[in-house]
Amino acid sequence: MRRLAFALLVPFALWGSYASADYRITRDHGGLVDQYKVKYVSIRDRGERVVIDGICNSACTLVLGIVPLNRICVTPRASLGFHMAYFDKSTTGGLKVMSYEGTADVMSYYPNTVKDWLSRHGGLTPDMKKVRNGPELWAIIDPCPDEIF
């Protein structure tokens, strides 16, 4: 009887640990790298979990290099988008000017799974490179348990 009770409780315990994910990304197109660093360091330091449940482009992808990968998962709706860093347009007269130093900085945060994927797809370029749900995304980050979505 005790085994049965334990067996019935385990799925609920696991569900609770993921269902109440502390931070859910659903539609994030990125922004200023330094602001994302501060946000994700804070999430990491509080021990929060992250569920990528939609678009995570540009600076949003820094989450993969700042929050431990074992505290991040992706749902079937997740997609990641990567491109070279560029200077804030407010400082360049509205022009999109690539930042090689910024790109190197962003790359230094990414885990090997991201670096490997980018290497196989030509590295960071001015154009957005997307990876969507499926084996390529799962090679970068684990899928979430079914219970969370």
What is each of the regions a protein language model found here?
Residues 1-6:
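Bacterial N-terminal signal peptides that target proteins for export
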Residues 7-14:
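Bacterial N-terminal signal peptides
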Residues 14-22:
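Sec/Tat signal peptide C-region and signal peptidase I cleavage site
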Residues 22-78, 84-88:
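Cleft-lining beta-strand/loop regions that shape enzyme active-site pockets
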Residues 23-25, 34, 38-51, 91-149:
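Charged, glycine-interspersed solvent-exposed loop segments at helix/strand-loop junctions
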Residues 79-84, 101-105:
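Short, basic, helix/turn surface patches
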